[in-house]
């Protein structure tokens, strides 16, 4: 889509239509701000990704939230997003290099909530609060220029856009790898971003569906640890009342090469018996190879302690560039709750700035003439 108003000076442009981006855009538009959200994918939700299977939806991205996470708990109640308790009852299966053991009780899972219609229902609820023309998909941002202290010029597939503020709602390492900034970001900030890990960026998530949750009939929780792999941990992903019936697990992307489906089927059979060997569906989502989630390797080791770094709580480029991905959150970084924390912070900062700008002299035109 070509921008029909190329000279329009918006209040904010949000890069990314995951939870953080949508949660930032909502309150800003509700307060009367002119906001545009640019999303590289052909869908909203980012790492909230569900797929339909017979009997319901299974999650290939984020799965849980916890009731002590106040913002997501409030959001699902406010929007009527259906949720249910993670299944916990039953024993745990543990696998080492030579044997499989059954241990009494669930040693892996803790009380958590799941989304009946998949985690992407949260993104849909947030998007439902936005004007219909607010979000543009398949529109990756390639450069952000700050020609003067008053505005940003954002270039994307659809053209050039102008805004008073830019909100980066994508993983920091992806932002610095895929977007050219002028002036260049401070060297320390660019390095911080490049070393901040992408949550789930090194993970392969696998979902196996079945006609019934047969493991429950055997007194198993669907929870398993494995030191042999390829899946390192496994959980019950069945929907309410066990429908759809599913198990899901995580594997490190660095621990496999190519198609791992046969290895996974053999592992599931070792852990849960012959009934697990032939799932109805075996869905594999390799987040490490998702170009709009994880940047190409840069030869350096990411440092998880950098998530939520104090620098991300600040704004840059004349106070017009703001960080809002879950990796930047001061609390719950990596969770959906963290995305909401980051969005809340940025909304407050941008609203304050816009109010101050309204009280001050008018901003210059997009041609950059001073007033």
Give a label for each model feature:
Residues 29-54:
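Glycine-rich FAD pyrophosphate-binding loop
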Residues 63-70, 107-125:
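Short beta-strand to alpha-helix junction loop
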